[in-house]
Amino acid sequence: MTEGEIPWGPTGELVYNRTYSRVKPDGTRETWPETVERVVSGNLALVDSRYQLPGEREDLLRLMREFKILPAGRHLWASGVKNAQHLFNCWVSGWTEKPSDHFEFTFMRLMEGGGVGANYSNRFLADYPHVKQELEVHIVCDEDHDDYADLAEAGQLSSRYDSDWVDAFVIEDSREGWAAALVDLIDTHYRDDVAHKERVYDVSRVRAAGRKLKTFGGTASGPVPLAKMLTEVSEILSRCAREGEQYRFEDGGALTGLDAMEIDHAIAQCVVAGGVRRSARMAMMHWADWQVETFTNIKQDSGSHWTTNISVEVDDAFWSLAKAPVDPLNPRSTKAHRVLKALSEGAVRNGEPGMWDSSLSNVGEPNEVVCTNPCGEITLEPWEPCNLGHINLAAFVTDAGKTDYIDLIRAHRLMTRFLIRATFSAVADPKSREVLDRNRRIGVGHLGVASYLALTGRRYSQAPGDKRFTAFLREMAAEVDRAAEEFSHELRIPVPVKKRTVAPTGTIAKMPGVSEGIHPIFSRYFIRRIRFSVLDNDQFLTASQYAADGYHVEKDQYDKSGNTWVVEIPTKDTLVEAVAARFGRDAEDIVESANELTLHQLLAFQALYQTCWADNAVSFTANVDPDAYEGVDVAADLQRFSGLIKGSTIFPEESFPQAPYERITKQQYEAAAIKAVADGVDEECANGACPIK
């Protein structure tokens, strides 16, 4: 690589321009070196310059320009942006004594482009008062509004009120304004006395669909999705009140975990209507909860809840019961076995629900963690954000197939310091500020791991038994811990409660073109699908160019607004060629793809990283052939690795239409009549969960 040359992966520049390159004041877009300069400057400015190491700025610039270190996408998008340095990708929304707090927090974080996890176990909602009021939402709008006709066509405009109604709740054109309307509606449902059961909301001030959103990117969705959301939320809460009447409760009916999950889905649908991948969620429920068996099948049975991943919370008690023979006289024993059956059969059916082990996850935590972020790599307290950065191991392999240890150690230490500085970034909610200051949690992760192993002549399946590699991981973990302790003591702040993780890194790994996270390459040949928002002019033009070039382009069937297109790109992985250049004919033996590995081998690799590297969690998707595995096979492996992994996502290939990737043969690839783009990593998270930024 010549000086100044950017080591893009085959589609890296496309992904960078679509996702992270900001528009400058003169109307042109940032180049990668300009983005790096902004990101590093913004990060260093969070802490007084006297705490910088000699040469730290120059090292950060170099390592990031060369894709040797890469902070999470939100840092790349927002770091160094004046008055908009929102650096945290994902959060967990908790539960307070006020029901609307949870939904307001979820709505705000999703509108900021973040992902939100929540635990819907009914123990968290048990102390809530009953929903007391049945209400009816009426939407009004000025007839001169650009979207007035769309509101009318969608059936959202009131036939009883208009925008001159003086008692209407006027919704301001801001995230806070939208959230205030939601809070008003929810709080009204809980009031003892309400004078007017018909709640009128005026959307005249909400900007029209398609307008640019400057701070977080994307485009405005207009008032229609907001109107639909308010109506749906009111219908859910009114149903709760009616059910209370049915059971002769004098003060209404209870909000259940599944009701709350339905409200969050309505909120997320409203947000995602504004453009591609602006909503990502994780929904969890405890295995012993009275609603869990409905929860495990809720996406399949309802055809809804497409805005979230779902996982069952298990614990030591669950594994103790599930590993023992079923006791038909013990209701907890029979339930544990039913839940394990649902987990294992769901895995080979459609990949859901996943599993999260709360007992293992809470080891070493000062306070209870209740859920993970949507991709599952960070377990969090209520209101806590995740704060991620990654080391690209593959970038430290020399031309001779050796590891540049000096620069690699430097990278681990500098990324640790980068993320600790980020904990000083502003957050919008004081509940988040409190837990962030107390925990200072960071997540230094690895990407390009499969690429690193292959480029150093090692097979992926043999890594768990490779003592050199396990020692290497422990050594790098120790470097992170030392750097965190030293820097935290200098800054007079608590040492981060946990420091190391593995994230999917789908979009991030796309830029240098290496394997994402710790996943093996998907296949030597496959179809990769990229999503584009047609509301964003640049993305629309790019997708249109793909169509003109002969690529297959169709609407995203999961985005009901019709605002997202899916482009299919036949893809050849480049790792085999790179390894062949170093090791000759052995490349085919060295490079292993996911379909050549057993579920046991995949989970063993996850367990390796969980035990030797991560004190947080490891986000990992084990893709399996549904024809080769039955539920009992999955159950056996889950039991075998219980206590070693904090969560699991086991995913059957081709389990849903428009999957991010689909394996094809070499012959199918060569038969494609279009120019293929060479690369081996998925552009989204491995489980399709992460936000676009």
UniProtKB/Swiss-Prot annotation:
Q: Which residues form the active site?
A: 375, 377
EC code(s) of this entry: 1.17.4.2
Q: Which cysteines share a disulfide bond?
A: 90-386
Q: Which domain of life is it from?
A: Viruses
Q: Name one GO molecular function term.
A: ribonucleoside-triphosphate reductase (thioredoxin) activity
Q: Which GO terms describe its biological process?
A: DNA replication
Reactions performed catalytically: a 2'-deoxyribonucleoside 5'-triphosphate + [thioredoxin]-disulfide + H2O = a ribonucleoside 5'-triphosphate + [thioredoxin]-dithiol
Report the family membership.
Answer: Belongs to the class II ribonucleoside-triphosphate reductase family.
Name of the protein: Putative adenosylcobalamin-dependent ribonucleoside-triphosphate reductase
Q: What is the protein's species of origin?
A: Mycobacterium phage D29 (Mycobacteriophage D29)
